[in-house]
Structure formats: structure tokens, C-alpha cells
Amino acid sequence: MLVPVPNAEEVSAENIKESVDAATLNGKLYGYPMTADNGYFMYYNKDYFTEEDVKSLDKMLSVAQAAGKKVAMEFNSGYLYSFFGNTGLKLSLNEDGVTNACNWNDTSGDIRGVDIEEALKRITSNAGFLSCPNGEIADKMKSGEVIAGISGVWDVMNAKEAWGADYGACKLPAYTCAGREVQMASFTGYKMMGVNAYSKNKDWACKLADWMTNEENQKIRFTERNQGPSNINAAASPDIKKVAAIQAVIDQSKYGTLQRVGNSYWDACKSFADTILSGNTGGLSEQELMDVLVDGITASTVK
């Protein structure tokens, strides 16, 4: 149990809204935002891609295919959200805090679930696409097989080692679905500091947490550890814009959603994505496959 932040109004005003939302429950702020870099984006090798190329996944796959290389992501994972998040279809956590609400199998919108499914089949069957575990992308960058990959700040040193001066990072690209360009989405995450409600010195602990997460210390944390600040003033620093990976996180966050999903989401996405990758639907129609995905996402894990 955490202590509500006593100077919540002040802390909220100093940090980006999304980081404050992440630390808020039932209208009360329970954490001091500290970083805003826990997201994912696109790394790319500038020797192969221009800044215009990386705006389009179709173009990136075309470039990779022509070069005999790959654009990589861990497709059979929660990253699947990237293709659904900005289509008008919805995924959310129910009020019980355990189960999910999801309409990814909708048949009535401008973009239907089966439209996304068809786009995913086209993307994953492209010779320039590679699905692999996130932990393997760095090695494939270094081997030369992968010239672009979706990952996070944890891979920044690997990307720099692999591509040197040609290392680049940017927001996720758009992909083609139902005849239109759809900006890929992402889950966003934030680190924060909280105070134990059972602390014998709660007041002093709150003061310490407030100080450790203030503007100056977030700047120091960026300088010494390359961690992206949640503090508005610290994030506006010109030095931030010089670090491609941190700037990519910030740019992608405009198209992201706070990661709040029930546990059933993860296994359902993996199963669906594995089916897409294998091409073996077990005789299910496209709509039936989408229905199975949504049934899995919305299933209760409570025994």
C-alpha cells in the first residue's frame, strides 16, 4: 500500500500527463513520476533507409527484401497491439481490474478485425519481415541480418555497436490496412517512486521521493544513465533531442496507450500471432479466427 502524494497538484503540473495518469488510481496520485522511456519504437540502419522510408512499414519491408535483409519484431507477443491500437477498435481493462474488454473482431467499422488480419498476413509473409524474440534482435543487428527492428531503450547500445554512425531511431511507421495508412500504436510505460504507507517516517519519505524525482535529478539521471525524463521541463532540454532513442520514445508516445491489460491478453495474442505466422488456421475462417482472439483476450483468469 502506498501513501497518496501530498503535493499531488504540484507534481502533476511538473510531469507529462501520461506519467501522472500511470501513477493515479481512483483520482488519487500514488507515485512520483521519474522516467518516461519505457516504450518501444523503431531502430534502423541509415545506410539502408532514408528518413522518408521509415515512415512506412511497406517501404521498409520493400527495402529490406531488395537488400536480402530483415525488419524484425517480436510479432507473437503483446507487441501485436501495435497493429490494432490506432484503428478505432478498442481494448481496455474492465473495472474489476482483471478482465479485458475488446472488440477487435468488430465487423461494422471503417476498419474491421478481418481487415487487420489480412494486413498482418501480408506483412508477415513478406520476405523482408522477421518475427523473433526481442532478446535476439540485437544479435541479428550485429550479424547484419536485421537492418531495422522494433525494440526499446534497452537496446540502444546494441544498435550503436551494430551500426555505428548509421544508427537511427524513430517512432513506429504506418502500415497499410483496408486501403489506408494506419499509424502503428504502442503500449507506454513509466517508472515512478512511491512511499510505503507503513513507513515510520512517511512525511520525510515523501519529501525524499519528491526530491529524487524532481527536474534537476531527472536531468542528472538522463545525463548519467540516458533515462528519459517525465518532467516537462527536463524533457524539453535540447540535449534530449540529440539522443535518437529517447526522442523516438517521446515521438511514439503520442500514438501510445498506457499498458493496462489483464493477464489473458498476452497468451491470446501469442496464440493468434503464431497462427498467422504458421498460416495454419485449422480450418477457421478469418472472422472465426478474430472471434477466437477476442474470446481469449476477454476470458477470465480467475479460478
Region roles according to the model:
Residues 161-224:
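Extracytoplasmic/periplasmic substrate-recognition and gating elements
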Residues 1-40, 169-172, 241:
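Hinge/lid segment of periplasmic solute-binding proteins
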Residues 60, 84, 139-144, 148:
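Hydrophobic residues within well-ordered alpha-helices
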